[in-house]
Amino acid sequence: MKVLGIFFIIWGHSFPPLMRDFIYAFNVPVFFIISGYLTHSEPSFKAFLKKSWFTLLIPYFIICAIKRMDLWISHVGDGKTWLSMFGVLTGFHKFQGIHACTMMWFIFTLFLMKMAFQLWGKNNRSLLILTLCSLIGCVAFNQSGYDVGWSLTDALLAMPFYVAGYLLATQWSEPFDWLYQYIKRSSVWLWSGVALLLFIAIYFVAPLNPGVEMFKGRYGAHPWLFYLLGVVGSFSLWIISILAERVSGTHVKYLTRLSAGTIVILGFHRDVANPIEQPVKHYLTGTVGYDIGTFFVSILVLLAFIPLLWLVKRYFPLLLGRRRG
């Protein structure tokens, strides 16, 4: 499921004009639901910080440093270096107009949500309060008109997805597992049709909620529609991932490699995509042609990361959130 999600992240960052609203309705929410599903409280806050340091923060800081190194070296004298570094340390997409964590905002946002969950996600009551406070803060920010691109406001927007994922793994696990087994043994054609119909519905409904920008904490014109489409789109991807399990066979090891390397793909996919995308921009100038062209470019980018992630895992596992040895 993470592989499907990262594909839509890659494709979405090509900004296909006909598919943009459709993709942005669910391509980021699905990752927060998955993250919530996989989360659990550590025995202590110290243990949480230690785990987060290796699995999230070290890859985050290294990738941000690699991406911003040219800016940091060339702008020491005019102060932009320090503004960018401060933005990276505090989770700003940009800080005072200077590039900071940019596409790595998701990782810092995830760290903040995990920390909030570790501190206040102990029981149903605290989870409800955490979710309600996040929603209130999110609505207040959207109504304020501020435009900051900060991981804290992004975390407020994403927290309901994260909590929903956690509940699927815990309190809702029994019906969730039953549905999983039911889909696995049911007709592939039936559930393919269900996923397709849901995607078609999202495609036509998503434009009714313009302005969705999760990296800016923006839910668009209608918050209820934002959360509804995020859940429905994630459910559709989940169906497709279950069906894919039945036909993947020996290719599953490559999917596992891609799934384990989402941090690296998130950080560097545009560096791989840009040179491949140039012919598409040059020759396919129409909207339909550009959408189709970038769809296949996104597949090529994903495939290119299979050997790249093998090299990273072998020689620089810290980028994958792993310790050596």
Can you say where each PLM-predicted feature lies in the sequence?
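Alpha-helical transmembrane segments and their immediate juxtamembrane cytosolic regions
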Residues: 1-325
